[in-house]
Structure formats: C-alpha cells, structure tokens
Regions:
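A short interface-forming secondary-structure element
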Residues: 5, 47-61
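Low-complexity, compositionally biased segments
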Residues: 12, 20, 42, 63-65
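Short edge beta-strands and adjacent turn/loop segments
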Residues: 25-49
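Acidic-enriched, low-complexity/disordered segments with a strong bias for Aspartate over Glutamate
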Residues: 39, 55, 60-62, 81-82
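Low-complexity, Ser/Thr/Pro/Gly- and acidic-rich intrinsically disordered stalk/linker segments
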Residues: 39-43, 70, 80
C-alpha cells in the first residue's frame, strides 16, 4: 500500500472542490469541508458530509463525490487537529 500525504482540512477541502468542479455537470457544486473519520486507522480517513449542489443535478454530484473520494482518498489523508 502506498503512503498518503497528510493535508489540513482547508487544503483537502480546496483539493476536493477543484476535483469536484472538474467533473461533468458539477461546475457549480461545492463542499463546505471534509470530516475526519476518527476510528479509521488506514486508508482514507475523511469523508464529504455535505455538498452544496448549485445548479448541478444530484445524480451528477453523487457520482462525482464517489469518484473524488475514491481518487483523492488514495493520495491524501486528513490531519487530525488543524
């Protein structure tokens, strides 16, 4: 398993928003922040709890959130205390 890079909540939120808006149909969607999953010891230790849809369709955003979490979760972990 490849090691992930630690990011602050602000950094990870920025990365997730950029990736989310790059997905088809999600140009106006955004997240407020990511949430730490405290009992997770390996792999992705964060989740996207809420998304502001903007003009995006929920079906497009659902697909995009799953894709973004999967892709960025392999690269980054959320640092515990900001």
């Amino acid at each position: 398993m490849m090691a992930t890079v630690g990011r602050s909540n602000a950094e990870l939120t920025e990365l997730v928003n950029a990736a989310l808006r790059g997905q088809p149909g999600c140009e106006t969607a955004r997240i407020i922040g990511v949430r730490l999953m405290p009992d997770v010891r390996s792999g992705r230790n964060w989740e996207i709890p809420n998304v502001v849809l903007g003009d995006s369709l929920i079906s497009d955003v659902d697909r995009a959130v799953i894709s973004v979490q999967h892709r960025l979760g392999r690269k980054f972990h959320l640092l515990g205390d900001d």
